Amino acid sequence: MKTRQNKDSMSMRSGRKKEAPGPREELRSRGRASPGGVSTSSSDGKAEKSRQTAKKARVEETSTPKANKQGRSEEISESESEETSAPKKTKTEELPRPQSPSDLDSLDGRSINDDGSSDPRDIDQDNRSTSPSIYSPGSVENDSDSSSGLSQGPARPYHPPPLFPPSPPPPDSIPRQPESGFEPHPSVPPTGYHAPMEPPTSRLFQGPPPGAPPPHPQLYPGSAGGGVLSGPPMGPKGGAAASSVGPPSGGKQHPPPTTPIPISSSGASGAPPAKPPNTPVGAGNLPSAPPPATFPHVTPNLPPPPALRPLNNASASPPGMGAQPIPGHLPSPHAMGQGMSGLPPGPEKGPTLAPSPHPLPPASSSAPGPPMRYPYSSCSSSSVAASSSSSAATSQYPASQTLPSYPHSFPPPTSMSVSNQPPKYTQPSLPSQAVWSQGPPPPPPPYGRLLPNNNTHPGPFPPTGGQSTAHPPAPAHHHHQQQQQPQPQPQPQQHHHGNSGPPPPGAYPHPLESSNSHHAHPYNMSPSLGSLRPYPPGPAHLPPSHGQVSYSQAGPNGPPVSSSSNSSGSSSQAAYSCSHPSSSQGPQGASYPFPPVPPITTSSATLSTVIATVASSPAGYKTASPPGPPQYSKRAPSPGSYKTATPPGYKPGSPPSFRTGTPPGYRGTSPPAGPGTFKPGSPTVGPGPLPPAGPSSLSSLPPPPAAPTTGPPLTATQIKQEPAEEYETPESPVPPARSPSPPPKVVDVPSHASQSARFNKHLDRGFNSCARSDLYFVPLEGSKLAKKRADLVEKVRREAEQRAREEKEREREREREKEREREKERELERSVKLAQEGRAPVECPSLGPVPHRPPFEPGSAVATVPPYLGPDTPALRTLSEYARPHVMSPGNRNHPFYVPLGAVDPGLLGYNVPALYSSDPAAREREREARERDLRDRLKPGFEVKPSELEPLHGVPGPGLDPFPRHGGLALQPGPPGLHPFPFHPSLGPLERERLALAAGPALRPDMSYAERLAAERQHAERVAALGNDPLARLQMLNVTPHHHQHSHIHSHLHLHQQDAIHAASASVHPLIDPLASGSHLTRIPYPAGTLPNPLLPHPLHENEVLRHQLFAAPYRDLPASLSAPMSAAHQLQAMHAQSAELQRLALEQQQWLHAHHPLHSVPLPAQEDYYSHLKKESDKPL
């Protein structure tokens, strides 16, 4: 049992927190109040929540609670696990399917809790989120549900939550914070805590209160001074909020270990922040605002808890906090870690969102989930632990079922489970928890399962956890054995975390859970929790770990509690002592890389721890009380005792303890019990500590809480009430039974006032009033909490405004963009008109880049050449004009492109040379002249200035001429630039132009007017056309096509042979086409112009003439033939693209044609066969 107890403690802490509605609430409260766990969680959650909020806002709400839960650490996990505890699930899942009023309440509470918790939990979850996924099978679900439900729940719970949650959060926060702060102080506070605990008890969360004022204050102060509520709540919630705010949290969060989680949260929360809003919302939206402050509190507090911080660190590390944040989901640090590992981020995040719920679940899933659950389970820990664990595990989903269980199934399981759970449950009492509790009961089997899981998990877990695996199992065992040795736990936790990472992804949530759980279980719950918790929640876990551990380790526990609070690890470690917090932290941190997790845990745990501590302490509960003189001690003892003595007694004693704890703690009535025991202890555990306390208490206490079951319920109630810090005590009577609570009555009476807030009891659930949602708190004016809330609200408002502004700006930008586009269109039209009239204004450029044309797809080098490709290059634009008949054609019928446009494929329109030429020559020439002039002017900068650049492009036969230059093969293959065939090309240097002109003949002379040149080209084309009849000429012309095409592919292949052949052909065969004079295609054929220094090519041989021949006409028309030079690069580019496919087709066609006319080739073109076959092959290949 001890182990279990520990586990329970942890469970409680982890799961507990989450589990019991109370816990959850408490968690939430605690989450809120507990800076650490919750805070962290919360914060985390918050951050996460924020994040999630955004995403999961709702879910997150749920999640928030989750976060809280997470804070609960994995309370939710556990919860999830436990979701088992129906409540959780209920909350989450159940939320959707609220189990029972309680559940609902729980939900509510939980919601709130979730709110707060969510954050933490979320965070955890986030951490877990990692796991989110991770766990959340049940957990996730649960978590999700939780988150989601929670969201809902929180949403609804919100109503109360607002006040309450915030309150609770503060309380939670505070406690947590206290925890956090506590931790540092814990020792001291313990005592005070104790006393305060009681109030805290009531506050449970109020661990701080336990810290009593000091802690509280500290908490609060630490938390946020008054922040306790504020701060801590904030922490948790705030944390969440902060986290949410998150980011603020982040920073803030960071500071606080608790916050760390938040930070994680922050990180995790990054999302959470969004979530936090939720959380805050749920948790107390304000809290959101406050959270920052809270966080600050938290920070103060948090920092204190090194564990947390370590968590933080670790957290910061990915593992816990870091992980958490990082994973954000790491939430469950390890869970997250694991989850994170696997899921980590995604889930984390997603989980965060979705995971958020999931995260929780993941947390849940992760060990956390289980832990949480387990924690619940663990809480039940021994029995419950098993049960719970199982439950958790089982429950994870079972939680759901458990939820059903929740009904009070849990009570039965409660026996032990319940015992544990009850507390949990009791805490959960809030329905959620109850559910959980119940859940756990059902889970008990799972527990077995869990246990098995434990083992199994360990295996899986380990496997999953990898580290965890080894560790967990070992740790599990370790924990188990070591149960009291939280350290192992931490380690396991760590491991878990580490491992968890892995496990989380998949099953490990369960396994994790399991592992955790089982860790926890084996551990004692503490471990479970620790493991679980630590690992899942990391913070929660950790804290649970330590908290539990703390608890678990009674001795150390006491301090650990502190420590626990402080650092689960600490606790865990033996650091139990406050010192441990550090130590723990260190160890835990160290050990636990997850200490980071612990941060989460811490948050949770811290909270938990604190609470646990408180709880423990108080709960120490009572039992511990004696043992744990220091609260922690007490707690520790309690836990320790607890574990040790108490556990047994615990479980059994639990009731008493529970009672003690519960009543006292729970009730807050008895200071120890009240705070320590339950409220603090149980409640603490349950509520604030819930996770811690819950775990601790629950775990520890919980077992005692078996009794606390009832107590826990109280605790739960208290926990819920806890938010009402002091209120708690008054709030919940000490109902022995945790079974379905009576339907809540709406009372709306002030229940308790803390330094920073006034708690109003919204619903009276009779003895079972533990749902955080039952209470809502209104921050007192002037309190830090109020300030934080205001700040948060302000911040949110500012952010919203900022977003709105940005949106408007974007809208305006879009409008401007559209306007610009319209302007461009107008300019384009104008340009076209002007261009047609010969004075293409500069706007012409816009023509170039006409949207339709992919202007020049990089079909070829040419196409890719910057000058051409740059849509903005003037040359391009000009070319585009040419290339885009549709652009130019519109107004002018005479436009060369005009006629062809309608008939031909747009891509080729420009190339319908025959059509072009058929139009009125005079008009065409005039236009061309004008255009050419314009183009030249415009091109000068683009092309003439960079002739060298272009030449390569156009070195080719004339790119203008060559349809293929587009191919690039040719283009690339340009002959000596000097030979650039395209006399017209602006890029040609004057000399080249000169040379070309001379070579090509008058038609090409640069000095010729464009019109003249066109005429010359036309003549040339005609000449060629005559040749067109000559198959050889045609062939050669065609050759160019295939060749070019091939060119692009294999430059050298036939090229050389063909070149020779063609050269011969062009030279000898077709004297007609004197290579130089006529830019016959022959010459041009396949070789880059460079090859044939025929300026022929350059001269626009008008293929259009050639095209006129049937053979070539179709293909050519299709292919933008090498059209006239005037067509220019744009055309070429265009053609090029269009051509590629065409070319291949053409080549094949020609090939056949060639075969038919082979004899015609006077020139031996042996390569031709080759070439064609090659070509054919090529054409089969994609271009």
Curated annotation (Swiss-Prot):
It is found in: Nucleus; Cytoplasm, Perinuclear region; Cell junction. Predominant neuronal expression, Expressed in most brain regions including striatum, hippocampus, cerebral cortex, diencephalon, brain stem and cerebellum. Highest levels in cerebellum. Also highly expressed in kidney and testis, low expression in skeletal muscle and heart. Residues 1-603, 617-760, 780-855, 921-940 are annotated as: Disordered. The modification N6-acetyllysine is found at K634. Its main location: nucleus. Transmembrane segments: none annotated. The modification Phosphothreonine is found at T646, T662. Keywords: Acetylation, Cell junction, Cytoplasm, Isopeptide bond, Methylation, Nucleus, Phosphoprotein, Transcription, Transcription regulation, Ubl conjugation. A motif (Nuclear export signal) lies at residues 1026-1034. Residues 261-272, 377-400, 562-584 have a biased composition (Low complexity). Residues 510-560 are annotated as: Involved in binding BAIAP2. Residues 872-887 are annotated as: Required for interaction with FAT1. Phosphorylated in vitro by MAPK8/JNK1 on Ser-732. Residues 157-173, 207-218, 344-373, 701-711, 732-745 have a biased composition (Pro residues). Residues 17-29, 45-63, 107-127, 788-832, 922-940 have a biased composition (Basic and acidic residues). Induction: Induced after vascular injury and by growth factors. Decreased levels with INF-gamma. The keyword Transcription regulation applies. Interacts with NR2E1; the interaction represses the transcriptional activity of NR2E1. Interact (via its N-terminus) with FAT1 (via a C-terminal domain). Interacts with BAIAP2, WWP1, WWP2, WWP3 and RERE. Interacts (via its N-terminus) with MTG8; the interaction enhances transcriptional repression of MTG8. Interacts with PQBP1. This is Atrophin-1. It comes from Rattus norvegicus (Rat). The lineage of its organism: Eukaryota, Metazoa, Chordata, Craniata, Vertebrata.
